[in-house]
Amino acid sequence: LILNKYTELGYSFYICWSYYKLLFMKSIFKFFILFSVVFDVNSQNLKSPSDFLGYDIGTQFSRHSQVVDYFNHVSEEMDKNTLLINYGKTYERRPLFYAVISSQANIAEIENIRLNNLSALDFNDNRINDKAIVWLSYSVHGNESSSTEASMQTIYELLTKRSDLLENTVVIIDPCLNPDGRDRYANWYNQTTTIPYNTNKISMEHKEPWPGGRANHYLFDLNRDWAWITQVESQQRLNEYQKWMPHVHVDFHEQGINEPYYFAPAAEPYHEVITKWQRDFQFMIGKNNAKYFDENGWLYFTKEIFDLLYPSYGDTYPTYLGAIGMTYEQAGGGVAGLGILNSEGKNLTLVDRVKHHTVAGISTVEISSANSEKLNTEFINFFKNKDDNTTYIMNGDKDKIDQLSRFLKNHKIDFYSSDDQKLSAYSYNKNKTINYSISTADLIIPNYQPKGKLVDVFMERTTKLSDSMTYDITAWSLPFVYGVNGYSTSKKIELKKYKEKKVENLVDKKAIAYAGI
């Protein structure tokens, strides 16, 4: 008997099957409707920065406590898409934190994504990660304050209007690297400004007094501290950065009020360790940013002023760790306030400054998402491709060597000791090759390790410049920074675990005791 709808039995079977198929399809439909409603309800519960703060974003300077409150709100309402990480406090006890956002599926697997990405630093680990990791850093200079406002708008738009980008991308947003400096500026401005604000640059609200909000509590420029990590904000942030090792890092800044917006590609000189891919992708990011700026009729420039050389900036340090590191500069700064007339007579408003940073940030996430696989492949290649083997040898006073070893530990750079031996080595102090005898007390740093390119940058004696016009510092060699004797050799040395010498405070039992009155 053939079961088909033209036989009595087949027809009955067909009717039953059609009925249950209809029930099944209705159930599936209801499930998707329910899922969509749940997601939509979560999105609807998430307030925009303007709705949450009670004023349109960019019409006031938000205090750091308000920024904290908004990110807590985002974390609570979008908990399946967001992780909020508190990583420390400033000298003035303001919280330091960042948000990790992505799709629900990615957040559920976020630890695996993080560890898979870090496997690029292990020569023997071949785990594969196909998610792009983009880190956005705001307001390292406190009075370049529009970017913190933009961080709130950026996280809101990524979770609502551009959630598609989060399917294959993890975005890390640190809304304020320098809360002490930023609150110093915001509090001064809020106390000084008129209502409505005055756009005349000679008015008091455009005359930020010393010490200003640029620096942190100890008036240290945190954008010169990525390598040296002398400040507590930098120390805590570096520890978190090394847990993620992003593929793209953007450092948001502000510049003079008459300048158009600046984004990548950077100006020459580029350091020689920067790869062709890192150069090329800067151009790709710049073109994508330019597309949106052109659509809005916003002025911008590239390849001028801001180079990629000195290793202690928020663009170069990530670059020497395999990322596409970039500085974005918006017109503004401490002089701009809520609005100011520039030399062309145009009103530069905080509202517009926030828009520019927001669009540039989301554009960067967009192009990174579109190239997530290539970003991962090239990130792995950055750490595994090493053309030369150089070993650096350090000796000197114990306290100076100890300081150097702490520096290396903080950057997770491997260092060792070795047995006594003689070899030919280049002397940093004498600037020539000499015969040198290694001792067991010497500290030895090979560049044939995952962070070997960063080692080469830190150790170079003479900076190689493709252009004599540089933005800032041109010398930073570690032997001279720490006042130790430095040597380098191309010979591979048998390495042993480094053992720090313990300090022995000996008491002379025969010493004559005396008392002073």
Task: Please describe what each predicted stretch is.
Residues D174-Y292:
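Hydrophobic, small-residue-rich alpha-helical packing segments that form membrane-like cores
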Residues K26-L34:
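Sec-dependent signal peptide recognition
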Residues Q44-S145, E149-V170, R224, T230-V232, ...:
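Intrinsic-disorder/low-complexity accessory segments
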